[in-house]
Amino acid sequence: MKNRLFAAIASLAIIVAGCEAQTPSSAPSNWTVSSGMPPRWPSGLQAAPDAPPRIVRIWLSTLVIAPGSTLDGAIATTTNVASVEVRTAAFSINSLHVAPGQFRFHTRVLELPPLARLHTYTLDVIARNTAGVAQVEQAPLEMK
């Protein structure tokens, strides 16, 4: 019974991993990856409520995570962005809206299933306005 369950889980993990789109090779130019948030951070850019959302700048503490590590981030957007989601195939984070065009998040990485480790995933940062229109930016996120 245990062998069948393990085989089913392993097969499902392989199928899910195979379904993931091409992982980007690097972060876009408006991303900063460093241990501390950049001192000169842009304010939210003014935008009409019905204008398309726009991600101006993204800061992440790292693009390599492991169980027990933390992941911090800040996203500067246009002022019409209602929500920012940070997502991979393994997890999803809803960022805190701290000011017009400003979003932050902090999360501690919990234990990862063995099949999810030692893999590079696509990290999606999704900004949405109130109409649900989205802008997505992607970077590689390595799980150890």
Give the positions of each predicted feature.
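Short proline/glycine-enriched turn/loop motifs at strand-loop junctions of beta-rich domains
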Residues: 76-82
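C-terminal motif of bacterial Sec signal peptides marking the signal peptidase cleavage site
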Residues: 16-18
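Short, compositionally biased P/S/T/A/G/V-rich stretches that sit at domain boundaries
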Residues: 24-71, 76
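Surface-exposed, short loops/turns at beta-strand junctions within beta-sandwich domains
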Residues: 111-119
